[in-house]
Amino acid sequence: CMVGEIRDLETAEIAIQAALTGHLLLSTIHTNSASGAIPRFLSMGVKPFLLAPALNAVIGQRLVRRVCNKCVEEEQITPEKLAKAKAILNKLPEAEKKNVDLNNLHFYHGQGCEECSGLGYKGRVGIYEIFTMNKEIEQVILSAQVSEYSIQELAVKGGMVTMAQDGLLKALE
């Protein structure tokens, strides 16, 4: 079952009732991150005891520019940016971290060419974060002590790769 964007309480309640009756429901809601969806639903007036069992997973996504394949070249980044990238990547779940050599990071940029009209970028790529519901997140929702930060913290603890981490992983490819 597919519901267009959820913008109000009436649409949210219909979607939640469908999910609670066993239908797999896909929809969209505007937030800055996957963890922002839960506080957004609650701010609309959705009751926590209905929301918690209705959710299976939440996906956050953004489209970012892709470096042009024709004029790509390695970029030397500042020590500050490198330290920030390492700090973000160091927080990856262990399963993902084993694929990254933090001591050998290479970043790229496009210098601009005819193919990309001198921009250095051509096309877009999605960066994502996905968290699945677990008992801890459900308990936080039911306690009504919900913040985007608390949900994000629990999702990361449960193995979620954040959009920033996914973006850095894709930049390293």
Segments predicted by a language model, with ranges:
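Short, flexible helix-loop junctions that flank or precede catalytic/ligand sites
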Residues: 2-173
